[in-house]
Design a protein with these regions (language model features):
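P-loop NTPase Walker
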Residues: 1-124
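Conserved P-loop NTPase motor core of helicases/translocases
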Residues: 2-20, 129-147, 207
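Conserved helicase NTPase motor core
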Residues: 16-49, 181-257
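Residue-level detector of secondary-structure transition/capping positions
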Residues: 65, 93-96, 123, 172, ...
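Short alpha-helical linear motifs
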Residues: 80, 99, 134, 229-230, ...
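ATP-hydrolysis module of ASCE/P-loop NTPase motor domains
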Residues: 102, 123-188, 192-199
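Solvent-exposed, flexible loop/coil residues
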Residues: 118, 137-138, 203
Length: 257
């Protein structure tokens, strides 16, 4: 599928020579990589680790940033880690193009940080939640230590650990044990710590899931804001994250990648 807002952007041989020089003159793209750089349709590029996929992505982003005609709509680049952002900082951070890519209107970061920034955090703040810490291990430990000693002992005898102290699958749902009093206490501790601003990474995605289910206009607004999406390290994106991405960027049956 051709991405509508890119219809008037063409990547030429001159652009590729320019970006090779921009990246220090140490990169030279062969014909297969040139074809990938010039492609303006949705595509899944698969290659073995170390083959230079992220380098190609950074080069393409640099060219697109140079030609980008929109001041309020941006390019969205997501990855499992911050590898794409780090490579842009390393190769292009001291250039005008690099600074453009790393600032508004573009977004380059992890899947988690994207949904936090544009879905979960705005909803939580608008509903009166303060945000203090988003960290799975720290929040597990905090909640576990808020349980009475006898309840922790009971859970340990059920072969449960600190990881039980978070919502699972949906907001308000937990991994339940046989003792209903313990279940109610777990739910109470989770709810109280969330009111105090403490969330796990997984819970933030669950809130994103909840918001996207309840507010159809949010995916449309995000698509207008980011008409093009790149996903690096796609093989590391789990099923739950893919479902969220498809909910946001898949309005016409295809991801705008």
């Amino acid at each position: 599928m051709e991405i509508e807002k890119l219809a008037n952007i063409e990547i030429t041989d001159e652009d590729i020579l320019w970006v090779e020089e921009m990246m220090g003159g140490k990169v030279h793209f062969d014909s297969a990589r040139v074809n990938a750089l010039k492609n303006m349709d949705s595509v899944d590029i698969q290659a073995f680790p170390g083959s230079g996929k992220t380098t190609i992505l950074v080069a393409k982003l640099a060219i697109l940033a140079k030609k980008w005609p929109y001041s309020n709509d941006g390019i969205c680049v997501l990855s499992h880690t911050n590898v794409a952002r780090e490579e842009i900082e390393e190769r292009l951070g001291n250039t005008e193009i690099g600074r453009k890519l790393l600032s508004y209107p573009h977004f380059i970061g992890t899947v988690h940080s994207f949904f936090d920034t544009y879905v979960s955090l705005p909803w939580l703040k608008s509903n009166g939640y303060e945000i203090n810490i988003i960290d799975t291990e720290l929040v597990h430990s905090l909640r576990w230590n808020k349980l009475p000693r006898n309840k922790r002992y009971y859970l340990e005898r059920q072969y449960k650990s600190e990881t039980i102290c978070e919502y699972r699958d949906n907001i308000g749902n937990i991994e339940r044990v046989k003792n209903e009093e313990t279940n109610e206490l777990l739910l109470s501790v989770i709810e109280k710590t969330q009111k105090d601003g403490y969330f796990t990474f997984g819970e933030m995605l669950l809130y994103a899931q909840k918001v996207l289910k309840e507010w159809d206009e949010i995916p449309k607004a995000i698509q207008r804001r980011f008409p093009i999406l790149f996903i690096d390290e796609a093989q590391d994106t789990d099923t739950f994250q893919w479902d969220l991405l498809k909910k946001v960027f898949n309005s016409d049956g295809e991801l705008s990648i």
